[in-house]
Each structure stands twice: as structure tokens, then as C-alpha cells.
Amino acid sequence: MKFVVRSIAFATLAMCAFGAFAQKGETVKIAYIDPLTGLLGPVGNNGLRGFQFFAEKFNKTNPAGVKFEVVAFDNKLSPAESLNALKAATDQGIRYITQGNGSGVAGAIIEAVNKHNERNPGKEIIFLNYAAVDPDFTNSKCSYWHFRYDADTSMKMEGLTTFMKDRPETKKVFLLNQNYSHGHQVAKFFKEGISRKRPDIQIVGEDLHPLGQVRDFAPYIAKIKASGADSIVTGNWGSDLQLFVKAANEGGFTGNFYTYYTSVTGTPTALGKTGEGRVFQIGNGHARMGGEMDKWQDEYKAKLNDDFYTGQIINIYTTLSEAMAKSKSTDPVKVAAALSGMKTKSVFNGEIEVRKTDHQLQQALFITVWGKVDKKYSYSMENTGMTMIPVKQYPNYVSSTPTSCQMKRPA
């Protein structure tokens, strides 16, 4: 497996050639709207620390010479609270918005951003979606002002079902997901993908549960074991995966997990030494990508006593600063035009592209498996002595999925 690694310094030198420092020293505020309290608060706080940590890194050297400042808003995982936070942010003159936890929230923000920009010409805002993966956001509900940096569910499930196709031991699957758009889409795209690639696999059960409300998953585990499932497919994240895994361990489920978010706060600790070789994740990276990424990951842990697992944050700062350099402006209208269709090199994930047709980032994806740290994959997640070890890489031309987006662009 070969990873393409480039430093921010390289990007800086490249952009200097374009006379990119027109905005040097200008402060660019980014409103971070995510849950900072409640059961899913630990995930939101991890994301906030990631944005703040890499703001400091990029403030030292970025091709536009701007200074990034992150302003946090606790949305309590509520669409209504998120819209209040968005209003507060725009009232403060903040014109860049980011959010990632909960597609229900992201959908509300997209609609609100569209309305704001229609009603307030000259005060446009951009939504930098770092983790909400409902495919509709870059298909039927696509927006010129929305840019998604995580791979959407259709992309992730295309990779995951391709991987599962070649695992003959997987014969009976139970789907357990959160009862909102993301969970619905995980189930939908799994069924579509596996029926094409492994029609012999049986779906022996399916359940949905309230987002961020269940504290005891033992009844779900009992149902899964009774179904005869040898594998679970879940898009759960945060406490909903952490507590689910805990219940599986306590309930004696010894089958495979196919997940999106095993790396996310709390789940590594819940897994501990269990699950070796049978808990899989699809994502845009892993714990030892090489080069500068390894250095940053270790520094992040030493400074914050936390794991960094959201590489999308780095790609946001990379593309945003390059777009500001290219447009010689921090005006969202000019920056959006520069972002749309941008191709560049990620610090950790090779060639990436902000696809012009729908603003979905095109990037490589990896299948990883829970296993013991070793010399090559030495990063201990949540100090468990375990890590996510890469077993398969899908280049961006493989992970890419088509779009039906008919984007309305500014005149």
C-alpha cells in the first residue's frame, strides 16, 4: 500500500507562485455547530478539539496567509438548536459554518444556508460538512453552498459490500441502525449493494433505535443472537456504537461487525482487547498513514490526551486555504467558486477532488480491522494496546459513486 504524502509547506510554496497572499493576516472565523453536551457530547468535543488543533497548525503556514479562528456552538444534537446557533453565528458576521454529527441537523443547516444566501446577497455563507453522510445532500438536495468532506453512505457502502463479497464466512447479517436518515440510508445501500454482489447473503433481521437515547442494548443483542446472524452491519456512532459493542461483549456475541465509526470516541475503550480480527471499519484513513500525519497524531494525543480520527478536518483547511489563495479573497462567493472542482493533494490521503457537479469530495477509502498494535501500526487507540489495521484500500476512482445533482449555481 503506497500513500502519497505532501506537507502544508509544499502547498504553501506552490500557491506563493500565484501571488496568493492578498489576504495575509486576515482572520477567518468558522462556526462549529455540533453537540458538546449529552450522550453524544464526547464526539462533538473531539471534533471541536480537532478543528482548534489544526487551526493552530494551519495558522503557522497556509497558502492564503489567513488566520483561522473556531467559534463553538452547542447544538445539543437538535436541528432547532442548530438553526439558533446558525443565526447567532451570522449575527456575529461568521460566514463559514461547519457541522458533522447528525444528518438531520445537516439537512436543516443546508436549507437554512440556502435561504440565508437568497435573502442576503453580499453576506453569503458556506457550509463545510465534515461528517454528515446522507447521500441526498449531494444528490436530490444538493446545494452550491454545501461542500461535503466525508465519503457519503453510498460511497462507504459500495466499498464495504465489495469487501464483504469476498468473505465467504459472512452468510447471515443483522442490520442495526439509528432511526434517522443516516441509519435508513445505511440499511438501504447495504441491501442494494449486497444483493448485486452476494445475493446468497441472508438479512436475518433489521432494527432501528432512537438516536443518542438508548443506554442498554442488551435486548438488541439478544434479538441478534436469536436470529442466527454471524455478522452485524451498523452505521452507529458515538455512544450508540460504544454501548452497543459493550452489550455485545457482555452478551457473548462473537460474530463480525462491519462499521463506519469504530474509531470514534468511546468505542475503542468499549472494545478493549475483544473483537480482534472481527470488527471492521470503512473510512478515509487509519491510525498510521505515514509522514506528517503520524507526527500530528502523536502530538495531538500528547497535548490533548485524545485520539485524532477525523482527517476530513485537515482536508477542509487544506482546500479552504488554497481556495482563498486562488481567489485572493475570503469572500465566500469567490471562495466557493474556487473550491468547486478543486483538485489537490491531501496531506494524508493522496489526490482529492471537490467534484464540481455536487461538491462531494472524491477520496480514497480504507477497510481496517481491530487488532493489536505492532511495529508498523503502533498507534494505541484510547490506550487500549489495539488499533485499526488497514486490510484493503479503494482508490478514489473506485470509491466514487454517481450523482443525480442538478446544482443551481449563482448567476
Can you describe what each PLM-predicted range is?
Residues 27-52, 73-80, 101-102, 176-185, ...:
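Extracytoplasmic "Venus flytrap"
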